């Protein structure tokens, strides 16, 4: 939850006195025009940037007191724009969602999870394709799969799980937007 979040850019209030509470199993969608501060709010809630005023808490702990490593276990973020500089395959990109957690061990469970997420996102057929050869919509689905695998790793714990998506349907065709 958050308490009285405020953010300013160049002395202009972008966000002012925002209180949000999200309970387990709830879905929250934030709508507004371009430039309204939706991405900034997501970045504050995820701990990527710090608000000028107010606080964000995960399970009663201030996000500013939570290590980056621990944040990786309690939330997964898919930002509005994500680029891949190197020549990775789709599978490599999704697998990085697991490695972001600092666990470099490989097992059949990881392989099954990756295949399951690729199938769920309907991109299994792209598994060995190079990311930079994909369409914008296909790239978006790969990043979504990567976000899901980040959450899957610890899904058997009682820790709160937060999937934060910024413009999740950007570049997707209508059928995938609906799914």
Feature roles, as predicted:
Residues 62-76, 104-107:
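ABC ATPase NBD coupling module
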Residues 2, 15-17:
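Conserved structural motif at the start of ABC-family nucleotide-binding domains
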Residues 46:
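Helix-to-loop junction immediately C-terminal to a conserved catalytic motif
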Residues 130-134, 138:
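Conserved ABC ATPase signature
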Residues 109-126:
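Conserved ABC ATPase "signature" region
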Residues 156-158, 163-167:
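Catalytic Walker B motif of ABC-type/P-loop ATPase nucleotide-binding domains
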Residues 31-33:
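The feature captures the beta-strand-to-loop junction immediately N-terminal to the Walker
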Residues 54-62, 162:
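Conserved ABC transporter NBD signature motif
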């Amino acid at each position: 939850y958050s308490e009285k979040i405020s953010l300013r850019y160049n002395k202009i209030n972008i966000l002012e006195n925002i209180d949000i509470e999200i309970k387990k199993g709830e879905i929250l969608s934030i709508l507004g025009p371009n430039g309204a501060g939706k991405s900034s709010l997501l970045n504050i809630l995820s701990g990527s940037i710090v608000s000028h005023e107010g606080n964000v808490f995960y399970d009663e702990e201030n996000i500013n007191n939570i290590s980056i490593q621990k944040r990786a276990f309690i939330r997964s973020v898919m930002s509005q724009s994500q680029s891949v500089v190197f020549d990775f395959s789709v599978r490599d990109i999704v697998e990085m969602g697991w490695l972001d957690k600092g666990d470099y061990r490989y097992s059949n469970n990881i392989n099954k999870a990756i295949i399951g997420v690729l199938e769920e996102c309907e991109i299994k057929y792209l598994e060995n394709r190079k990311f930079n050869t994909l369409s914008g919509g296909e790239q978006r689905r790969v990043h979504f799969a990567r976000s899901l695998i980040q959450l899957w790793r610890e899904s058997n714990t009682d820790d709160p799980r937060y999937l934060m998506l910024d413009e999740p349907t950007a570049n997707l065709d209508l059928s995938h937007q609906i799914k």
